[in-house]
Curated annotation (Swiss-Prot):
Any one Pfam family match given in the protein's UniProt record, by short name: ThiF
Protein name: tRNA threonylcarbamoyladenosine dehydratase
Enzyme Commission code: 6.1.-.-
Function comment: Catalyzes the ATP-dependent dehydration of threonylcarbamoyladenosine at position 37 (t(6)A37) to form cyclic t(6)A37 (ct(6)A37) in tRNAs that read codons beginning with adenine.
Gene this chain is encoded by: tcdA
Transmembrane spans: 230-250
GO cellular component terms, semicolon-separated: membrane
Top EC class, one word: ligase
GO annotation, biological process: cyclic threonylcarbamoyladenosine biosynthetic process
NCBIfam families: PRK15116.1
Organism: Haemophilus influenzae (strain ATCC 51907 / DSM 11121 / KW20 / Rd)
Length: 261
């Protein structure tokens, strides 16, 4: 074995030895071979990518087409003065390589949609993490993964909340206090033949919070419905958006290691 290869192995083990000591060396080796897709690299998804990179995941695929805006600074990991206007996927890819130089990072500079999901999702992922906030796209993505036996976890709305202790994971059929996931659930039942029986599980993990939403104060000349769709919409804090992401990654790693053990 060459010196360069040995140095790379030693470097990886030095960087992520703490993960191996926590989960076992064999588990770290499995994470090193894992390929995870993150869809939506925003207030939640950027923290998902960070946690995956720092867990020694060997390959990541990042799907998003948004650039970084100054209004993202309150909650999105890559948003800083020097990154405004840059693509979120590119900034996060560069960051991942600084954390783990041997990680393969694939960038898909596009928004996932029903029209392209068959292409973007059939790439041998060990897990897909859904961190998008469009109801129809979210439902279509979940249904596609379910139908094609692709492991997926979905993440609910992280805005309008302040208490990270109320975040939890449950089956998508059982979430409460989350309007986004409630709408997704309705679309899945209406358009994708998911069970109408409230007692039957969807077998899809979902991250959500039980905290009642905190609505922003009304802005003059902007109705409640309009406020939720403009720059004065739900407020959001890093402590919440990051925790949503960390919950998702924790569950994904747990499932990956249990599946392969």
């Amino acid at each position: 074995m060459g010196i360069t290869v040995m140095a790379r192995i030693d470097n990886y083990e030095q960087r992520f030895g703490g993960i191996g000591r926590l989960y076992t060396p064999d588990s770290l080796a499995r994470l090193r071979q894992a390929h995870i897709c993150v869809i939506g690299i925003g207030g939640v998804g950027s923290w998902v990518v960070e946690a995956l990179a720092r867990s020694g995941i060997g390959e990541l695929t990042l799907i998003d087409m948004d650039d970084i805006c100054v209004t993202n600074i309150n909650r999105q990991l890559p948003a800083m003065s020097g990154t405004i206007g840059k693509l979120k996927t590119e900034v996060m890819s560069e960051r991942v390589k600084l954390i783990n130089p041997e990680c393969t990072v694939n960038i898909i500079d596009d928004f996932i949609s029903p029209e392209n999901q068959s292409d973007y999702l059939n790439r041998g992922y060990d897990y897909v993490i859904d961190a998008i906030d469009n109801v129809k796209t979210k439902a279509s993505l979940i249904a596609y993964c379910k139908r094609n036996k692709i492991n997926v976890i979905t993440i609910g709305g992280a805005g309008g909340q302040t208490d990270p202790t109320q975040i939890q994971i449950a089956d998508l059929s059982k979430t409460i206090q989350d309007p986004l996931l409630a709408k997704v659930r309705s679309v899945l039942r209406k358009d994708y033949n998911f069970s109408q029986n409230p007692k039957r599980k969807f077998s899809i993990d979902a991250v959500f919070s039980t905290q009642p939403l905190i609505f922003p104060q009304m802005t003059e000349g902007c109705s409640t419905s309009a406020t939720m769709n403009c720059a004065n919409g739900f407020g959001a804090a890093t402590m919440i958006t990051a925790t949503f992401g960390f919950f998702a990654v924790s569950r994904v790693i747990d499932k990956l290691l249990k599946k392969k053990s």
